[in-house]
Amino acid sequence: MKIKESLAVGSFAFFGGILRYLIGLVLNQPTGFPYGTLCVNLIGAFCLPFLMRYIVARLHLSDQLALAIGTGFFGAFTTFSSFSVDAIRLVNQQQWSAFAWYVGISMVGGVLLSLLADYWAVKLTHNPEEQEVSQ
């Protein structure tokens, strides 16, 4: 067992989980649309691919720190299980329109934001103007 990596992941997960909880407190309504869960999942869908492509490459983060941020922070910050529970709650309440919007925005929006983040990170990583300045 890799104790050091496990502690790093757990430490970062602590902060990711707390931030998700606080956003949920502010945005989620007990019987309404799950804005908090949608928000954290879309933020995570953008930030994690960007982090993995750009920040790790540019800042030369260690594998251990990348693991702690990716698996720890963003793993705790984003939540597929809460997404699923929220979707089921909308179905049980027969809020069909809200269910369709929630699932659609979560899935399509998440993938599109991930693609955008990756594209943007590649562009920033391979910026020819910046490379000329640094040479």
Curated annotation (Swiss-Prot):
Catalyzed reaction equations: fluoride(in) = fluoride(out)
List of residues binding Na(+): G75, T78
Pfam families in the record: CRCB
Keyword Transmembrane: yes
Transmembrane segments: 7-27, 32-52, 65-85, 96-116
Keywords, in A-Z order: Cell membrane, Ion channel, Ion transport, Membrane, Metal-binding, Sodium, Transmembrane, Transmembrane helix, Transport
InterPro entries documented for this protein: FluC
Annotated membrane topology: Multi-pass membrane protein
NCBIfam families in UniProt: crcB
Protein name: Fluoride-specific ion channel FluC 1
